[in-house]
Amino acid sequence: MKIYKVGGAVRDNLLGLPFKDSDWVVVGATVEAMLAQKYMQVGRDFPVFLHPETKEEYALARTERKSGKGYTGFVVHASPDVTLEEDLKRRDLTINAIAESDSGELVDPYHGQADLKARVLRHVSPAFAEDPLRVLRVARFAARFADLGFTVAPETLELMKQMTQAGELEHLVPERVWQEIHNALCTNTPQVFIQVLRACGALAVILPEIDPAIHTLMALEQAALATNNPVVRFAALVHDISAEAVVKMTERLRIPNEYSELGHMVCLQHTRCHSADRHAADDLFLTLELTDALRRPERFELFLRTCEADAHGRLGLEHEPYPQAALLRQALAAARQVNIKVLVQEHKDPQTLAPAIRQARISAIAALKA
C-alpha cells in the first residue's frame, strides 16, 4: 500500500498558495485493508474513506469508463492493480494530476509542473470530454487563477467547444451548475468565468439569459473589486436583464432566495438609484419603499453596492464618485429616526396612522435636502 497526496493541495503548494485540506490516493490497497486500519468508508459510487484522525479523504486508485450521458455516467474500477499513473490520467487538468509521495517526491506523468510554470490550463487526455462538468470547472479555474496569468490552452478550449456543440452540457443537473457558478463568483475575477464560457459557447447553454456585453463584465468586475459578497456579484451579473428572466434563471438553476431576491430587485430598481440625486424627498422615500429598505436594511446596503458597481462598470467611470448611494443611506437613516410611538398616540384611527408615518418620514428626508 502506497499513499500519495494529490490534486489541489499539491497544485496550490507548488504555486505558493495556502490550502486547507489535502486529498489522498491509495495505491495497492483494498476496501478491507482500509477498514482494517480504521478508515471510515463514505464513498457511495467509488471507494472513498475518511482518515480516522484527520478526517481527510483517502480514495483508492481507480479508473473510470464512460457509460452514459452527463457527469454521472461512469463505470468505476478500483482495485489494487490500478497504478498511480492510471489514476492521475482520469483527472481533468494537468496541473491537478500531480502526486506527492510521503517523502516529498513529485510524480508528474502528464507534465503538470511545466503547465504551472507556463500558466496554462490544459486537459490531461481526450477522456476530459467524457465529463461535461469539466467545462464549467475549467472556466472556474480560469477565473480563480487569472490574476496569476493562467489561460486556457487552445486545444482545451477547442475540446470544450466540441463538448458544448455535442449537447453534453444539457445533461448537467441544476445543483452542480449553480455550485460551479457560485464558486466562480467567489473568485477574484468572476468575469473571466463568463468570458471563458462565452468563448466555448457554453454560456448560451448554461446562462442563456446573460448578455456578455462589455458593460456587464465590467459591472461584475467592479462588484468583485468592491466586495467579496457573491450575492452582490450575482446581482451585478444579472442587473441588465429583465426581472422575469432573473426569476426564470433562478428557478431553473434552483438558486438560493437571497440571490434571486437581490438580483430581481436590482433589475427593477437600479435606475431609480442612479437618479436618486435628482429626486425629491417623496421620490427618495418611494425608493426606500420599493426596496423594502426599512425592514431589510442589510439587503438594501447590498442593493446600493450593486448599483455602485453598475455605475462604475463603464470605461472612464470606474473611479467616479457615486453620491447617490450616500444620499439613500442618509435618507434611510432619517426615515428610521421618526418616532413612531408619538405618532401612534396622536393618531388613534388606524386609517390615518400609516399615512401620517409615511409623511413624517418624507418630511425627515426633506430636512436633509433643505
Question: Locations of the language-model features?
Answer:
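Catalytic cores of the polymerase beta-like nucleotidyltransferase superfamily
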Residues: M1-A370
